[in-house]
From Swiss-Prot:
Superkingdom of origin: Bacteria
Xref: SUPFAM superfamilies: Flavoproteins
Family: Belongs to the flavodoxin family. MioC subfamily.
Cofactor needs: FMN
Transmembrane segments: none
Annotated function: Probable electron transporter.
Protein name as it appears in the record: Uncharacterized protein PA3435
Gene3D superfamilies: 3.40.50.360
Alphabetical list of InterPro entries matching this protein: Flavdoxin-like, Flavodoxin/NO_synth, Flavoprotein-like_sf
Pfam family, any one: Flavodoxin_1
Domain Flavodoxin-like: 3-145
Amino acid sequence: MKVAILSGSVYGTAEEVARHAQKLLSAAGLEASHLPRASLDELKAFAPEAFLVVTSTTGMGELPDNLQPLYYAIRDQLPAWHGLPGGVIGLGDSSYGDTFCGGGEQVRELFGELGVREVLPMLRLDASETVTPETDAEPWLAEFAAALKG
């Protein structure tokens, strides 16, 4: 199964988690490809059969600048990905209250618009509680891989 891993990052942490996810999903036998800063055309050319989006949150609960162009292109064009499996790893800081993991929530809303089905609840990684988000994501990623392999 071809898994497109998309990431949005401000300081690079989400990119690190996405790269680690690619290694783990590939080791689990999936064809995982991290596509940072991909255009919609590049993403369509990859022909994903599943999605993993790893994103941090910036500002007042927004997506990072490097993920916004793809996010808005997908929202505008709504590709035919209905029924494909997906998952979201949201990074944030719970001290920001209501906007904690807001970037991930925006991706979840987009999944809903596209009909992408979340195979697991969003993983929320809290910067105020962890210094090893890649390691903290491993149990969730193992469960995600198992769900994709069915």
